[in-house]
Amino acid sequence: TTEIYTLSLHDALPICQSRHKADGARRDEEYREYIAGIPGPKIVVVQDLDKPATTGSFWGEVNANIHRALGCVGTITDGAVRDVDEMTNAGLKALARRLCVGHAHVVPVNWGCEVQVFGQHVEPGQLIHADKHGFLAIPPGEEKGLLDAAVFMDENECNTVIKTARGASGLTRTELLKQLNQSVTDFGEAARNKFGSPGEFGD
């Protein structure tokens, strides 16, 4: 499994105005110690406290390589990322609000805490599904049975609606609509039998 660890940070600009500058180096060390002390693989979820003024990025070539060395596989941030090609080469995946050209003076403020990114509250250790489309934070307590449900629904789609749609060649309009309607009914009945609800095509 992949554990989720959270971080909030400032990327204050100009550098001289960063209220965390004096102890920034020690904060970085403590943050790395925190990440290093947790078994991987890990995803770091970062709340940028300066947004929408994301003048700099915590994530770039250097931090991507550091975090890969610390057992991290990706990050989700409502701030910015940079050095996208270099991050890819490091093997660190990322979902971010935007790109930027510099790192400014980015300082970790809190870690191991609840954060809010893209309107979603995320707690340390919370299960997350993430891909190129975005991410979902799974509510605590809902993890059990999730894999079984996902596999079932995928197979249900493939055996009903998708199967019918892919086999539509040569059917008349009337035949196609009849088969589609039946496949939707079959999908709903299978979902209802499994979960007590007809799913996405239900009432």
Regions found by a protein language model. Name each.
Residues 1-6, 11-13:
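Short, small-residue-biased leader/transition segments that mark boundaries at the very start
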Residues 77-78, 84-135:
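A contiguous pocket-lining binding segment that forms or flanks enzyme active sites
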Residues 34-77:
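Extracellular/luminal Protease-associated
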Residues 127-170:
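A hydrophobic, small-residue-rich beta->alpha segment in the mid-to-C-terminal subdomain
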Residues 159-200:
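Glycine- and charge-enriched low-complexity intrinsically disordered segments
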Residues 25-37:
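Short, charged beta->alpha transition segments
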Residues 56-59, 78-79, 87-89, 106-107, ...:
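A short secondary-structure junction signal
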Residues 16-19, 50-53, 81-83:
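A short acidic, glycine/proline-enriched capping/turn motif at secondary-structure boundaries
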